[in-house]
Amino acid sequence: MHHVWIGIKDEVPSVFGKLHIKLVKVVDEMTFAVGEIISYLDMCAAEGTQLQRGMNFRLKSGRTVVLMSRRSNALYTDAISSDGKVITYEGHDATSGEADIPKMVDQPSNTFKGTLTQNGLFYEAAMETKSSRRPPELVQVYEKLFPGTWVFNGAFHLMNAYQEHDGNRNVFKFVLQLSEKTSGDKEISPDPERPTDRVIPSDVKREVWKRDGGKCVLCGKTDNLHFDHDLPYSLGGTSILVENIQLLCAFHNLSKSNRIQ
């Protein structure tokens, strides 16, 4: 990882336009590898702030970040497509100070003061992209695996947004499409032609972690771990079978990638 955010805000006077160009450069130079397992503290250090909410549009670093969870006790209903290339991310509720029962009121796009909430900021950016008025926002996606343990799912483009009724109220849905040039690919493989890794389903990740005991299957290390496809997706492998996913440390993950190339 390389911290290269210094001076970003001085070089991007407009809300859109130059910010996206500068942001892409920053993301290319500093990130985790796709599928890398990290601690909460590592994640916060990488993003330069203590992440306390799930939706974070344009942090001080210039990056946009979302935190997701598909655990049984997750507050929101996020979904991953069967091919692992699209995440449908649910917007966030009103705060307890704004509603007695947040799950019973529409997810807000504006605060009481009239400023945009995180829902509103993401929705506005998606509509700008949908109408071809700006490039898609690049979003870093982290998924909670266990308390204190996270996985970097990759860099995604915010392509669309809409509202739907969940039976009680209207909720926002944000469509994130896996970038064909994710920042994670650069660390795992220098080959620009290598197809982008797909997101591994959450239940598969948890089962693999349990089976492999939270350590590299080749050397037993417990740090710098990655979820690795035994047979790569580009060679016919799949992300949905536990049998095709294993835990590897960074060294063995990179060694395997170099052999494949």
Where are these predicted regions, by residue range?
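Short, charged surface segments at domain edges that flank catalytic/cofactor-binding sites
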Residues: A125-M127, K181-K215, S239, E243
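Generic recognition of long tandem-repeat/solenoid scaffolds
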Residues: V65-S69, F174-L176, C216
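Compact mixed alphabeta submodule
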Residues: K144-P192
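Acidic, glycine-rich low-complexity segments with interspersed aromatic residues
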Residues: H2-V151
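Histidine-centered nuclease catalytic patch
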Residues: C219-L247, I260
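Eukaryote-biased feature marking scaffold/signaling PDZ-domain proteins and nuclear chromatin regulators
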Residues: R134-P136, N153, V171, T222
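Long, charge-rich boundary regions
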Residues: A250-Q261
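A structural signal for short, well-ordered beta-strand segments and their strand-loop junctions
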Residues: V141, V217-L218
